[in-house]
Curated annotation (Swiss-Prot):
<comment type="similarity">
    <text>Belongs to the aerobic coproporphyrinogen-III oxidase family.</text>
</comment>
<feature type="active site" description="Proton donor">
    <location>
        <position position="106"/>
    </location>
</feature>
<feature type="region of interest" description="Important for dimerization">
    <location>
        <begin position="240"/>
        <end position="275"/>
    </location>
</feature>
<comment type="subunit">
    <text>Homodimer.</text>
</comment>
<dbReference type="InterPro" id="IPR036406">
    <property type="entry name" value="Coprogen_oxidase_aer_sf"/>
</dbReference>
<comment type="function">
    <text>Involved in the heme biosynthesis. Catalyzes the aerobic oxidative decarboxylation of propionate groups of rings A and B of coproporphyrinogen-III to yield the vinyl groups in protoporphyrinogen-IX.</text>
</comment>
<dbReference type="GO" id="GO:0042803">
    <property type="term" value="F:protein homodimerization activity"/>
</dbReference>
<feature type="binding site">
    <location>
        <begin position="108"/>
        <end position="110"/>
    </location>
    <ligand>
        <name>substrate</name>
    </ligand>
</feature>
<feature type="binding site">
    <location>
        <position position="145"/>
    </location>
    <ligand>
        <name>Mn(2+)</name>
    </ligand>
</feature>
<feature type="binding site">
    <location>
        <position position="92"/>
    </location>
    <ligand>
        <name>substrate</name>
    </ligand>
</feature>
<keyword id="KW-0479">Metal-binding</keyword>
<dbReference type="GO" id="GO:0006782">
    <property type="term" value="P:protoporphyrinogen IX biosynthetic process"/>
</dbReference>
<comment type="pathway">
    <text>Porphyrin-containing compound metabolism; protoporphyrin-IX biosynthesis; protoporphyrinogen-IX from coproporphyrinogen-III (O2 route): step 1/1.</text>
</comment>
<keyword id="KW-0963">Cytoplasm</keyword>
<feature type="binding site">
    <location>
        <position position="175"/>
    </location>
    <ligand>
        <name>Mn(2+)</name>
    </ligand>
</feature>
<feature type="site" description="Important for dimerization">
    <location>
        <position position="175"/>
    </location>
</feature>
<keyword id="KW-0627">Porphyrin biosynthesis</keyword>
């Protein structure tokens, strides 16, 4: 079947609705929607939940942008895209909880297509989800990765190991020599064997995110914590900011190509702190995190 951008867009709009409903059901607070238009073509729906019962901030963004020509920064790496009109669409979300025992989570699914008359379209899917705990719980990490593995299995035995490895490699802070979190799945440039297969996989990843995340939220959201744990959470959120502003390709691409800054930076935590040469106390749960987030096989 030839690529159907309209079908993908409808799935993404429904996915945004569903995830917002699921997060509201856990939290009690409602999302505020900000619809926006892009002068050069397209627009989106940014939805933010702030200061809820469970989530300090949750942002779920849908965007669909299109244009007559790709920016030079994109065609430099992909000369085959020169002279083509394009559509790029996706849902991207980040959830920052109040409770330090509840991990931060991120998910993204996206579709890109570039066309010109008389030529086959160039298209691909990308996406994934990853988890950033502040305090490590093995049962949470196992559940997260088991859910990821199980949704991949119908698409092949090698899919989960390949996309887990890619996730571990992508969410890595070179300047800190550490992982951002415990990973999950990351894929890009997916266009084989055919559109239907790739679209089905993207749908499985999009739907699988809440299956992976919400049971962990329910398990941890009522755990008691104090100022000590909160301070550590805010310190570790600094790593999230560092990754997004220094290494994340999506953030950099969006900012360099005139994307909507408010939506791009919606992933930022509302509060964060840095501390010069911070060293956690030896043997403490905070010190244990550096070992916990090292790459390993969780399932």
């Amino acid at each position: 079947m030839k690529p159907d951008a309209h079908q993908v867009k409808q799935f993404l709009l429904n996915l945004q609705d569903t995830i917002c409903q699921q997060l509201t059901a856990v939290d009690g607070a409602e999302f505020v929607e900000d619809s926006w238009q892009r002068e050069a073509g397209g627009g989106g729906r940014s939805r933010v939940l702030r200061n809820g019962g469970v989530f300090e901030q949750a942002g779920v963004n849908f965007s669909h942008v299109h244009g007559e020509a790709m920016p030079a920064s994109a065609t430099a790496h992909r000369p085959e895209l020169a002279g083509r009109s394009f559509e790029a669409m996706g849902v991207s979300l980040v959830v920052h909880p109040h409770n330090p025992y509840v991990p931060t989570s991120h998910a993204n699914v996206r579709f890109f297509i570039a066309e010109k008359p008389g030529a086959e379209p160039v298209w691909w899917f990308g996406g994934g989800f990853d988890l950033t705990p502040f305090y490590g719980f093995e049962e949470d990490a196992i559940h997260w990765h088991r859910t990821a593995r199980d949704l991949c299995l119908p698409f092949g035995e090698d899919v989960y190991p390949r996309y887990k490895k890619w996730c571990d490699e992508y969410f890595y802070l070179k300047h800190r020599n550490e992982q951002r979190g415990i990973g999950g799945l990351f894929f890009d440039d997916l266009n084989t064997p055919d559109f239907d297969h790739c679209f089905a996989f993207m749908q499985a990843v999009g739907k699988g995110y809440t299956d992976a995340y919400l049971p962990i939220v329910e398990r941890r959201k009522a755990m008691e914590y104090g100022e000590h744990e909160r301070n550590f959470q805010l310190y570790r959120r600094g790593r999230y900011v560092e990754f997004n502003l220094v290494w994340d390709r999506g953030t950099l691409f969006g900012l360099q190509t005139g994307g909507r800054t408010e939506s791009i930076l919606m992933s930022m935590p509302p509060l964060v702190r840095w501390e010069y040469d911070y060293q956690p106390e030896a043997g403490s749960p905070e010190a244990a995190l550096s070992e916990f987030i090292k790459v390993r096989d969780w399932v």
